[in-house]
């Protein structure tokens, strides 16, 4: 949570410089199409996550695809011309979400989920 709060603060500071970065229509279309694909896949994976009588396990099984979606959306954005202030934030999201995925996968194993 603290890393997410830090990311939000950094994004707020980056806003003025980022407003000056303009992408062309082709870039917007490519970015948007891929983002829609990523989001659809993320929700499909979340909805199809195995459920049982453990809220702990169910929550983590649903959150892992959510975190993967955040990683994929960040990687998608990094393919395009971005405000330089945004690049480290996206990299931070990738690192923190991948760490969260590993932690939840380990917990799932420990809990025999």
Kindly give the residue locations of the regions a language model identified:
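His/Met- and acidic-residue-enriched segments that coordinate or traffic transition-metal cofactors
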Residues: 1-113
